[in-house]
Amino acid sequence: MTTVLGIETSCDETAVAIVNNRRICSSVVASQIDLHKRYGGVVPEEASRQHLLTINPCIEQALQTAKLTWNDIDGIAATVAPGLIGALMVGETAAKTLAMIHHKPFLGIHHLEGHIYATYLSEPDWKPPFLCLLVSGGHTSLIHVKDCGVYEQLGTTRDDAAGEAFDKVARLLNLGYPGGPIIDQLATQGNPKRFNLPEGKVSLPQGGYHPYDSSFSGLKTAVLRLVEKLKQEKTEPLPIADLAASFQETVARSLTKKTITCALDHHISHIAVGGGVAANSGLRNHLQEAAKKRNLTVHFPPLKLCTDNAAMIACAACDHLKKGHISSWNLGVQSRLPITEVMTLY
C-alpha cells in the first residue's frame, strides 16, 4: 500500500491531497476564483502570491483530515508541468522542502497525467488501454493511455482550448468568469438549434481535414459576428440563452465526433474524459449517447474531480512510486511539456 501527499498549484487552485493507492484520504482545495473574477481571468502574479499564503494551511489541513502523520507518508509529489511558472514553483518548492525534511522521495507530476488519473479515483478497477479526451481551459487533447507514463497524443487543438473558448465567449456575452459553468447553466434555458454555428475543422496539406484535431478560434469569431449582427438589428433583446446553448451544442458535437471517430479508428473500446470541461452537461450528454450507439464505454469523473485538484496528482504519483520512478532534486518546473514526455520527469 502506497500513500502519497500531492500538491497542485499549476494555475488558480491551491490544492493538497493524500491518496492511498486509489483511495482519497483527504483532499483540500483553496480556490482563487473570487480573486481573479474581477480581472475576467487569471492574473499569474496574483495566483502565485495567493498560493504562497495558502499552501501551508492546506498541507496541515490535509494531514489532519486524513488523521495521518509524516511517518505514514511514503512519498511527496507536486505538479511541475505544464502551467504558470510562478504558481508551479510554489508547489514544487513546498514538496521538495517537505521531502527533504522528512526523508521522503519527491515526484514531479505532469498536470495532464493527473487529469487522466482522476478516472482511477472514481473507478479503481479502470485499466489501460483506453482513450482519454482531456478538455480544460488550457488543453484539448485525445490521448491514447497505454500504461503509467506511456501516452500517445492522437489529437489536439490548433488554437484555443475548449475551456478557453468557453471563457472568451462568456466574456463576449458579458457573463463573467469562469465562463464554462455560466454558459452551461444558461444553455439549459436556451434553444441549441436556433443558431447554426461552424464546427472548427483543421485542413490537411494533402486535402481534407484532420479527423481528431480541433480548432475553436473560428467558432469564437462566428459568435462575435453573430452578436454584432443581432445588436445592429435591435429587433429584440440579445438572446443570451440561445447563443449559449448554440455555442455549447457546437462544441459538444464537435468534440464527440472526433472522440468517437478516434476510438473506432484505433479499436479502443473504453473512453475516459478529464479536465474542467468534462463537467459540461452538453458534452456529457452528447458523448454518452454517441458511445452507447457504438457500444463503447465512456466514463466521466465526479464533478469535484474534473476541475484541478491534488488527489489526481497524488494518485498518479502512487503508481509512479510503485514502479520506482523518483524525480531528481534538480528537476525544475516547465510552462510547457508534451504528455508524451512524462518520463523525462524521472
Curated annotation (Swiss-Prot):
Swiss-Prot/TrEMBL keywords: Acyltransferase, Cytoplasm, Iron, Metal-binding, Transferase, tRNA processing
PROSITE patterns per UniProt: GLYCOPROTEASE
SUPFAM superfamilies: Actin-like ATPase domain
Annotated Gene Ontology cellular component terms: cytoplasm
EC number: 2.3.1.234
GO MF, any single term: iron ion binding
Gene3D superfamilies referenced in this protein's UniProt entry, alphabetically: 3.30.420.40
Name under which the protein is recorded: tRNA N6-adenosine threonylcarbamoyltransferase
InterPro entries for this protein: ATPase_NBD, Gcp-like_dom, KAE1/TsaD, Peptidase_M22_CS, TsaD
Catalytic activity: L-threonylcarbamoyladenylate + adenosine(37) in tRNA = N(6)-L-threonylcarbamoyladenosine(37) in tRNA + AMP + H(+)
Function (record text): Required for the formation of a threonylcarbamoyl group on adenosine at position 37 (t(6)A37) in tRNAs that read codons beginning with adenine. Is involved in the transfer of the threonylcarbamoyl moiety of threonylcarbamoyl-AMP (TC-AMP) to the N6 group of A37, together with TsaE and TsaB. TsaD likely plays a direct catalytic role in this reaction.
Family under the similarity heading: Belongs to the KAE1 / TsaD family.
Binding site for Fe cation: H111, H115, D308
Organism this protein belongs to: Crocosphaera subtropica (strain ATCC 51142 / BH68)
Keyword Cytoplasm: yes
Free-text cofactor note: Binds 1 Fe(2+) ion per subunit.
Pfam hit, one: TsaD
Chief subcellular location: cytoplasm
